[in-house]
Amino acid sequence: MKHGSVPATPEAASLVFGDRLEAAELYARILAGAGVEWGLLGPREVDRVWERHILNSAALGELMEPGERVADIGSGAGLPGIPLALARPDIHVTLIEPLLRRSEFLRETVTELGLDVTVVRGRAEDREVRDRVGEMDVVTSRAVASLDKLTRWSVPFLRDGGRMLPIKGERAEVEIEEHRRVMESLGAVDARVVRCGANYLSPPVTVVDARRRAAKPGRNKSGRTARSRGRTGRR
């Protein structure tokens, strides 16, 4: 894939990516080259590709546990999923992207970086995609949609107690209050704002952290009881 020129690697990158720093630097060049050429990154973003995009995404790794299965919905150029996979090789990342051209970019990028990352083309809200991806511990996203829509797309992927961790902006706390009722009706509870990367990013990354409520005994994930599924009605 086409590589572009990027600013000098910030010192924080070596701390975040460790022995995968060279792969992170390669990803930065891919974003600056093919990413711009394919329309996935604006040309003006190249100068801040590290702080605004790569380190910003990788900071999310502070919230992950070893071995967790993480889905990045609406992955686009691979943000936040690819930096997250580079920073945290002990988790498994799946990138979900509905557009063909973008999913091709993701597959080529993952191959060039040598990452064990799964790319699934499809819409997060489609049942077929959920069946292919399977149950996740975490669902994340970045600049994809409003919090109510993200909840509707994210919760069906999550195991009971799993977390949705979308990267949000300065209005995150306001957005939680605006959509809390809808989120809770969809099964996302205990929503709060957390911040990551404070040691090397200014401002730090703002993330909404919400947990999938455990299903009540006797209910499946759609909310229907086993008894109601088997009921045939009176004759």
UniProtKB/Swiss-Prot annotation:
GO terms for cellular component: cytosol. S-adenosyl-L-methionine binds at G74, L79, A124, E125, R142. Belongs to the methyltransferase superfamily. RNA methyltransferase RsmG family. Residues 211-235 are annotated as: Disordered. Keywords: Cytoplasm, Methyltransferase, rRNA processing, S-adenosyl-L-methionine, Transferase. Transmembrane segments: none annotated. This is Ribosomal RNA small subunit methyltransferase G. GO terms for molecular function: rRNA (guanine-N7-)-methyltransferase activity. Residues 213-235 have a biased composition (Basic residues).
